[in-house]
């Protein structure tokens, strides 16, 4: 596709190699995960609009079908950035010192917006969270930085 640079096409091909089966593409159920692996942040509604499914094995998305989806999602303006997430978490920062209660962050992730399940929150905290202090507070800016950093590729 003309508007996807060669390097990004290579990244997409790598994601397909990891997530899909040769010649068949990826399961449409995994569309959101594939886009997130490429540093995009699509909403569940956008994933569904782009052809994602709620059940496995309903349909496959081939590479040539995925590239226009990737390109369109990349142009989407409704993606949050670091500053947006920090502003949101400042609402929980009662002392205005860059910290919030871990329990409040956990509740927000489990119950608000496009909520996560318990296992997803546990994995997220294991990957991105500093230990809470004695009073249950965590520095939220470091959490957001780690959450939004580029994924680590192991050779």
From Swiss-Prot:
SUPFAM superfamilies for the chain: EF-hand
Top-level taxon of the source organism: Eukaryota
Protein name from the UniProt record: Myosin light chain alkali
Transmembrane segments: none
Keywords associated with the record: Motor protein, Muscle protein, Myosin, Repeat
Residues annotated as domain EF-hand: 7-41, 80-115
Subunit structure: Myosin is a hexamer of 2 heavy chains and 4 light chains.
GO CC annotations on file: muscle myosin complex
Gene name per UniProt: Mlc1
Source organism of this protein record: Drosophila virilis (Fruit fly)
One GO BP annotation of this record: mesoderm development
Entry GO MF terms: calcium ion binding
